[in-house]
Amino acid sequence: MKGSKFSVLIAGLVLAVTVLAASLALAQSGMVAAAHPLAIQEGEKVLLNGGNAIEAAIVTAAVLGVVEPYASGIGGGGFMVVHIPQAGDQLAQRFVIDSRVTAPQDATPDMFRGLTLDQIDTGGLAVGVPGALKHWDEALKISRELQLSGRLQGLNMTLSQALQPAIEIARNGFDVSDTFIRILNTHRNRLAKFPDSAALFFDLPTDPAACAPEAPPLPACHLTQPALADTLELVAAQGTDVFYRGPIADAIVDTVRHPKTDDPNILSGRMRKDDGVDDLALYDIKRRDPVTGTYKGFTLVTAGPPAGGVTLIELLNIVDDQRFPFGTAGFRFLELDTVHVMIEAMKLSYADKRAFIGDPDFALVPPPGDPDRPPIPITGLTSPAYAAERRSLIDLATSLPVEQDPGNPYCFETPPPPSACPSTSLSQASKGVDEEVVTLEEESSTTHFSAIDSFGNMVAYTTSLSSLFGSAMVVTCEIATCAVEGRRVGGFLLNNSLNGFSRGTSPGVRYNAPEGGKRPRSDMSPTLVFSPSGTPRLVVGAAGGGRIPAIVFQIISDVIDHGKSIQQAISAPRFVNENLAQSATTIGHHNTRHETPPFNLSQTLVTELRARGQTVIRNTVTFGAAQGIAIDPDTGALSRGTDPRRGGDF
């Protein structure tokens, strides 16, 4: 029977062999690390056929949007860090593509105030203008231009070509996993508010065991997405304008402004497409310089504001000191002093994140209510000297209280702004008092993947809908202008990424209040790591919302300080402290959180941490989903790490 579990089981065996064969051919072709074997397979096909890491990354991204529709796709956006190595007299190139969603032009600083978390996260209000398709198109244009100039090798791949594997999988379907069903079950109540969302997903079983790899064949575990296939085919045929200006744009705006639900608590969004404002048509990606830092002689290249790379660099800077000799006696892997210091660094760096990180383009001009506000202090936040000042607050004998105040990185800018120095602390009006729209989402609400090709080009790409299943709304077409040749476009989930904005009333919310056209702050931290000699060492990143910088921090330290393989580092227990006070929207986040078995910290370690004053609780589920590639410093051999928390380690 077409699409039967038996036929898919055979296909799965072939897929496993294909992925293994690709792994054995790594020295010739490169590698992809992603959260789903189909995405790895299609990305590595590109590499095996002579494609470059950028081309493989876009194919991988498109497939992930089909097989992980709850985590990413054309309804969201993200950040890609690219490295093109030196060739002859041509210097290495490194850049970031920023496709973070933007707020509609009608967004206002008070748009989320007084609302419940569910009103913000579910429905139209937190839907931002998605950037994924423009990102993919622009990345492939850059790749083709570099190939034309002789700077890059590859397949001269177009967006239409890159979308074909995703179209085929959406049309023919794939077998969902037990992980997919578990994630779906946590969001059934949200999805049930929208008949079109329920229709797409609710024919799947409710028992995760029914779709586990070892379960008997079950056709009900097979998911097809014909509307998404039609939409991707239309984009492949007509280009991104059909999404940002044409019938797909009409369908998006109609879905956002008129949510298809009977629930009176669901709010409409502010996205427009009319004579006055056309939010989708105004969207554009940003090509930015990466931010860089060092750790133990290694160089980090990552995505700066509005992404989370600055927080990651600050975390590593804080612990990079002779007081904390990670990897030696007393500071070994998951020992008390090691974990204690890392928790304290998280409190300090996360306080700074909420005070100073936002959309850098909007930070260039002070708002009327804050005329003395300087630009985002990126140099200060990533300065080792500033980290030393923050580090001085850490005591090995006891823990810092939660709700740590931010420091004053302005004084470490070059030159520092006169209004910020020589004061050594920020005034109350400048502190990051921040009623951030923090979801209670405990699972992976994003996806990350890494790619490296045989030419040495590397890509780290994190992309997101924000919460799992984003806004919970599937785009549908119920107006005449969004029908094309008798087919109605849609079939994909929209983000709720505007929940990344702050909604505090304090003047301290200086950089991250909602504004029209603005990108909300993000914690996505796709990262490249280079050895002291300059050779590539890691391509890594993670899903996990606000926990992402802390997760990537732990993985990098586990590899560099403790000699772990990339798979061991990704599979290791995790902990995070986001320096948030207990409140109606952040219950529990003021604690240091760790995971359930088999990823949990030992009870002995938890007891020791509590004796130092740390409040430690165990999450009800795991958090984060990291993917990475390690390059052996001696042989150049590649190894892949995939996260078992979301079905990885295959």
Model-derived features with residue positions:
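Bacterial N-terminal signal peptides that target proteins for export
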Residues: 1-13
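Active-site Gly/Thr loop motif
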Residues: 269-296, 391-440, 488-524, 528
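Bacterial N-terminal signal peptides
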Residues: 10-22
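Active-site rim segments in enzyme catalytic domains, especially the processed small/beta chain
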Residues: 66-89, 93-95, 262-276, 430, ...
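Noncatalytic scaffold domains of N-terminal-nucleophile
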Residues: 27-41, 45, 53-238, 243-245, ...
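Extended C-terminal subregions enriched in glycine
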Residues: 455, 498, 517-520, 552-553, ...
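Alpha-helical support elements that line or immediately flank enzyme active sites
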Residues: 46-47, 134-142, 238-245, 250, ...
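Internal maturation/activation junctions in enzymes
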Residues: 205, 273, 325-464, 619-620
